[in-house]
């Protein structure tokens, strides 16, 4: 199942998660020690300092260790910026569930899934964000302020168009192409804002308190995603609002997507103006030289890293390692909605998972802290593959327990337990990969190196999900019942079948075909390539060190 609450990993990719379509966590917070203070130097150096307007000047920073209370305003600002970042991510994650309730094809869902790619690809333009800026305005504000203004204006404009795009007017079908382009731009802007905020976080806080940046990231984006996804889906549902929040039933929910977009667009504009006016970036006398030239240097460095035999082997293996999970992760949640499970109920099932998603990385990191973190990845993989079959069984069972348009409480308990077990295996693999990436990254270029490895890891989950969604319809076999000599292979044939008094009945659901094939591919990878993946741990440090030519 795909997640309702999705984090972005501290590479900083998130997620996301990636972000999936209904219940799956693509990633989570870093294990303890995953935040590297030395990354500060790679982003902006200690020459960049930010102070509130009217605070002490750059030369007045105390030498003694600073309490977090002294920087509470900066910590709260970071937290709020990450909450804002989570809003468009959560909204984008809710759209597939809304589309599924409108019976769009899985081919359309596959097309829309490209929306979740920008966070995995932001490494392509991150060097530009780091190096190009207006010195007088501030290195990070040069990107943060215009990006958030564009997001706010975009949201307000979209609030006037979204009902038409979703087909809520005059019974039209959803305009999936326009929705995909729109939310792809949303995700692109959110990813750009993420680059700017991550960089600002490392210099806004003192070196003693920079670790709070990771906490702000994880907590803030989770809260934002919750607001934009879980809370929105609940308040948008007329059934949910009438059942739990109203005394008199109404034909629609408390809020609409149009209302939600307008509200948050206004919040973006107001708060961005306040940040632009009240929060200043100041620099000490030292100036980072040749930053523009650094763009070219960074891209050359990335190419040099990926050409290394050990890194290339890692990339090829990790890009194929998640094929076995693609049907379970990308399609299951949508199938449950198709079978009648209310989308807002699926979203709310993620709420009790939050404590588990916080605790799991802490527990698992104890077993990945040694010299061979990939052993946990290898051991968890077959259990996660088997849970994919359990998910398929759950989808098959769902219509059999539906009663009077609803589902009994024991059904939701079983779904929740299945999701919890899935989270254990998912986090075991995720924390294992993060620990390995941190272990092998060349400390001299740690920020760039680890970001590259984590980007490839996240792409390894994105492309199989898109392919899995795209293949559901071609693999599904439907028969025309009630009209002779007809089939249901094309949309035109389906319409003709209906006109002749027949109906199209699914004889073989492509989801079940995919589930079995994916698990077989997954076990094939685990048996033949898994040992080679583990063997990467035996490579010496020299295999992972990049030889730079200056």
Swiss-Prot record:
Expressed in brain at all developmental stages. Detected in hippocampus, hypothalamus, cerebellum, cortex, olfactory bulb, and the ventral and dorsal anterior olfactory nucleus. It is found in: Endoplasmic reticulum membrane. GO terms for molecular function: acetyl-CoA transmembrane transporter activity; protein homodimerization activity. GO terms for cellular component: endoplasmic reticulum membrane. It catalyses: acetyl-CoA(in) = acetyl-CoA(out). Glycans are attached at residue 103. It comes from the Eukaryota. InterPro entries: AcetylCoA_trans_1-like (IPR024371), AmpG_permease/AT-1 (IPR004752), MFS_trans_sf (IPR036259). The keyword Electron transport does not apply. Residues 1-74, 135-141, 278-300, 366-375, 427-509 are cytoplasmic. The chain crosses the membrane at residues 75-95, 114-134, 142-162, 257-277, 301-321, 345-365, 376-396, 406-426, 510-530. Residues 96-113, 163-256, 322-344, 397-405, 531-550 are extracellular. Its main location: endoplasmic reticulum. One of its GO terms (biological process) is acetyl-CoA transmembrane transport. The modification Phosphoserine is found at residue 42. It is a multi-pass membrane protein. Acetyl-CoA transporter that mediates active acetyl-CoA import through the endoplasmic reticulum (ER) membrane into the ER lumen where specific ER-based acetyl-CoA:lysine acetyltransferases are responsible for the acetylation of ER-based protein substrates, such as BACE1. Necessary for O-acetylation of gangliosides. PANTHER family: ACETYL-COENZYME A TRANSPORTER 1 (PTHR12778:SF9), SOLUTE CARRIER FAMILY 33 ACETYL-COA TRANSPORTER -RELATED (PTHR12778). Homodimerizes. Belongs to the SLC33A transporter family. This is Acetyl-coenzyme A transporter 1. It comes from Rattus norvegicus (Rat). The lineage of its organism: Eukaryota, Metazoa, Chordata, Craniata, Vertebrata.
């Amino acid at each position: 199942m795909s997640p309702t609450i999705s984090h972005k990993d501290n590479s900083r990719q998130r997620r996301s998660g990636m972000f999936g379509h209904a219940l799956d966590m693509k990633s989570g917070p870093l294990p303890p020690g995953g935040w590297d203070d030395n990354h500060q130097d790679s982003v902006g150096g200690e020459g960049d300092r930010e102070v509130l307007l009217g605070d002490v000047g750059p030369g007045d920073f105390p030498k003694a260790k600073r309490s977090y209370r002294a920087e509470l305003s900066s910590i709260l600002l970071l937290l709020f910026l990450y909450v804002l970042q989570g809003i468009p991510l959560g909204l984008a994650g809710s759209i597939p569930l809304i589309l599924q309730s409108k019976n769009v094809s899985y081919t359309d869902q596959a097309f829309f899934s490209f929306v979740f790619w920008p966070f995995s690809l932001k490494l392509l333009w991150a060097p530009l964000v780091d190096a190009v800026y207006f010195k007088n305005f501030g290195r990070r504000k040069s990107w943060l302020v215009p990006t958030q203004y564009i997001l706010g204006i975009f949201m307000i404009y979209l609030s006037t168009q979204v009902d038409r795009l979703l087909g809520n007017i005059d019974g039209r079908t959803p305009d999936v192409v326009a929705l995909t382009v729109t939310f792809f731009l949303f995700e692109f802007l959110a990813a750009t804002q993420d680059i700017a905020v991550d960089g600002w976080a490392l210099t806004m806080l003192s070196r003693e308190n920079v670790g709070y940046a990771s906490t702000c990231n994880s907590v803030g984006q989770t809260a934002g995603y919750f607001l934009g996804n879980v809370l929105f889906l609940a308040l948008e549902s007329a059934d949910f609002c009438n059942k739990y929040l109203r005394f008199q039933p109404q034909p629609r929910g408390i809020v609409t997507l149009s209302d939600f977009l307008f509200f948050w667009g206004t919040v973006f504009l107001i708060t961005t103006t306040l940040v632009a006016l009240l929060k200043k970036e100041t620099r000490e006398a030292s100036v980072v030289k040749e930053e523009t030239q650094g763009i070219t240097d960074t891209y050359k460095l990335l190419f040099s890293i990926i050409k290394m035999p050990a890194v290339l082997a890692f990339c090829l293996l990790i890009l194929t390692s998640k094929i076995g999970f693609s049907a379970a992760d990308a399609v299951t949640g949508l199938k449950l909605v198709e079978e009648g499970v209310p989308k807002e109920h699926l979203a709310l099932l993620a709420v009790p998972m939050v404590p588990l998603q916080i605790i799991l990385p802490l527990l698992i990191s104890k077993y990945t802290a040694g010299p061979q973190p990939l052993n946990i990845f290898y051991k968890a993989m077959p259990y996660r593959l088997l849970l994919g079959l359990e998910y398929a069984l759950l989808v098959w069972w769902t219509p059999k327990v539906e009663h009077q348009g609803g589902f009994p409480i024991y059904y939701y308990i079983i779904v929740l337990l299945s999701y919890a077990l899935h989270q254990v295996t998912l986090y075991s693999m995720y924390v294992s990969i993060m620990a390995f990436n941190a272990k092998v990254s060349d400390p001299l270029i740690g920020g760039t190196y680890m970001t590259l490895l984590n980007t490839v890891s996240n792409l390894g989950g994105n492309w199989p999900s898109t392919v899995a969604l795209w293949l559901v319809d071609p693999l599904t076999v439907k028969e025309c019942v009630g009209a002779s000599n007809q089939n249901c292979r094309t949309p035109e044939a389906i319409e003709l079948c209906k006109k002749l008094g027949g109906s199209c009945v699914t004889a073989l659901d492509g989801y079940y075909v995919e589930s079995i094939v994916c698990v077989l591919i997954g076990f094939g990878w685990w048996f033949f390539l898994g040992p080679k993946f583990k063997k990467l741990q035996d490579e010496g440090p020299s295999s992972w060190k990049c030889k730079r030519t200056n």
